[in-house]
Swiss-Prot record:
This protein's name: Adenosylcobinamide-GDP ribazoletransferase
Membrane topology designation: Multi-pass membrane protein
Domain of life: Archaea
Keywords: Cell membrane, Cobalamin biosynthesis, Magnesium, Membrane, Transferase, Transmembrane, Transmembrane helix
Keyword Magnesium: yes
One Pfam family hit: CobS
Record organism: Thermococcus kodakarensis (strain ATCC BAA-918 / JCM 12380 / KOD1) (Pyrococcus kodakaraensis (strain KOD1))
Catalysed transformations (reactions): alpha-ribazole + adenosylcob(III)inamide-GDP = adenosylcob(III)alamin + GMP + H(+); alpha-ribazole 5'-phosphate + adenosylcob(III)inamide-GDP = adenosylcob(III)alamin 5'-phosphate + GMP + H(+)
Needed cofactors: Mg(2+)
Entry similarity comment: Belongs to the CobS family.
GO molecular function annotations of the record: adenosylcobinamide-GDP ribazoletransferase activity; cobalamin 5'-phosphate synthase activity
Keyword Transmembrane helix: yes
InterPro entries: CobS
Location of the protein in the cell: Cell membrane
Length: 231
């Protein structure tokens, strides 16, 4: 797992670029690391803990995926054919669609956490990382960036092992709180983003992976917040 950490977090560990794509199965395990500090903040019940937890999350994982979400949203909302949408997505300038998407995702996370137990963010991060693994499993690269490099290393064995880890980590919470099972519905957000990306861009790049991660996490928290509110 050490080799994949530098690509998914800001934790200062040395990873081997060549070996990283052979550790894609460890994506779900990364959720344990990326959610550790935010979960501790929520567990301690500090003032404004929901806001502090989200800040701690992005301090841990960085803003790369959030930036990808902004670029992805600009591309999706652009009018024109596939080439035009890809051109807009790759533009370094952020448009109103990208800004709107980032603000909404951040607000959904902050406000949903107010209604949820301390371990909710871990489940949301688990879904987020697994959704990225599913995106890589499509093996439909757009361009020749990091996403394409990881897709080359993706295979059935890595997906199967990653899925097993996802299930085991999820069960560790579900057995304690059955309502947490509803969190699996958050994966549908990720699957939908993957489908939209393939339809509009005919492939997936790093921006699409970032959007998948961010929207899956926010969607999972919203679903769980609704379940906790009504049940």
């Amino acid at each position: 797992m050490r080799n994949i950490l530098p690509f998914l977090t800001r934790i200062p560990v040395k990873g081997d670029f060549e070996k990283a794509r052979n550790e894609l199965w460890a994506f779900p395990l990364v959720a344990l690391v990326s959610s550790a500090l935010p979960t501790l903040i929520l567990y301690l019940g500090l003032p404004l803990s929901n806001l502090l937890a989200v800040l701690a999350l992005y301090w841990t994982i960085g803003l790369l995926h959030l930036d990808g979400l902004a670029d992805w949203a600009d591309g999706i909302m652009a009018k024109g054919d596939r080439e035009r949408k890809i051109e807009v997505m790759k533009d370094v300038n952020t448009g109103i669609a990208g800004l709107f998407a980032v603000v909404i995702v951040l607000l959904l996370q902050v406000y949903s956490l107010q209604l949820l137990p301390f371990y909710a963010l871990f489940l949301a991060e688990l879904n987020s990382k697994y959704a990225m693994l599913l995106a890589l499993a499509t093996k439909r690269p757009l361009g020749k960036g990091l996403g394409a490099y990881f897709m080359e290393g993706m295979n059935g064995r890595q997906l199967a092992l990653g899925t097993l880890l996802y299930v085991l980590l999820g069960l560790s919470v579900v057995l304690f709180e059955p309502r947490a099972l509803a969190g699996i519905l958050g994966l549908l957000f990720g699957v939908h983003i993957i489908r939209i990306s393939l339809k509009n861009f005919d492939g997936l790049n790093g921006d699409c992976l970032g959007a998948t991660a961010e929207i899956t996490r926010a969607g999972t928290l919203v679903v769980m917040a609704l379940v906790w509110w009504y049940l």
